[in-house]
């Protein structure tokens, strides 16, 4: 929300944090998918374990895919991408940032209502929001790896890497989970691996091709 720069100095004792537009390739060299993000330049100025967000080890993905492969053809692999992931989480700190150039106005800045890419706690806030939503859907969170989830009633397993989801389960169960996730997140469906009609023969997961 728009705020006066004088408010920023009064509440934080500092000038608004810098910001910029960044083009990010969410695809690869063969199939580029360029997205423009408005980011805050705060991460490089502060480091703390308090703002660390977990990522799953590669072994977790290998185990998930191995379990799916050994369970038979009825188990599918689904890949989803959360769009504008960090914007789903509300800001918990008072953060003032510079307005983007096209909206700049002398004497004004912006106070964050939701997290933005580049704020130091955005990954942690997204992780907490995501965990809350998945648990509300019936998933149990892993103890050894907080990025791993299991829905016992539906038999669906899920690994989260940042804003990417890899799920395994029966087709009907995956459809039910996806319906619940679409109600909570902006999602892009990247495909389902399997032998059925409309299913893919290969998928790219974390820059690795699986078949």
What are these regions (language model features)?
Residues 1-211:
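Long, low-complexity, charge-biased intrinsically disordered regions
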């Amino acid at each position: 929300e728009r705020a006066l720069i004088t408010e920023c100095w009064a509440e934080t004792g500092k000038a608004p944090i810098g910001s910029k537009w960044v083009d990010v390739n969410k695809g690869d060299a063969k199939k580029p998918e360029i997205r423009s993000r408005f980011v805050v330049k705060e991460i490089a100025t502060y480091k703390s374990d308090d703002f660390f967000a977990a990522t799953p080890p590669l072994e977790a993905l290998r185990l998930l895919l191995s379990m799916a492969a050994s369970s038979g053809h009825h188990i599918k692999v689904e890949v989803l991408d959360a769009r504008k992931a960090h914007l789903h989480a509300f800001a918990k700190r008072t953060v003032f940032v510079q307005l983007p150039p096209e909206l700049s106005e002398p004497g004004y800045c912006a106070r964050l209502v939701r997290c933005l890419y580049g704020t130091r706690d955005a990954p942690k806030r997204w992780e907490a929001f995501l965990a809350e939503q998945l648990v509300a859907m019936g998933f149990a969170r892993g103890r050894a790896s907080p990025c791993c989830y299991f829905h016992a009633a539906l038999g669906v397993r899920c690994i989260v890497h940042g804003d990417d989801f890899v799920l395994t389960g029966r087709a009907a169960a995956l459809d039910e989970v996806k319906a619940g996730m679409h109600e909570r997140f902006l999602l892009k469906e990247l495909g389902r691996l399997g032998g059925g009609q409309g299913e893919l023969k290969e998928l790219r997961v974390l820059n690795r091709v699986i078949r």
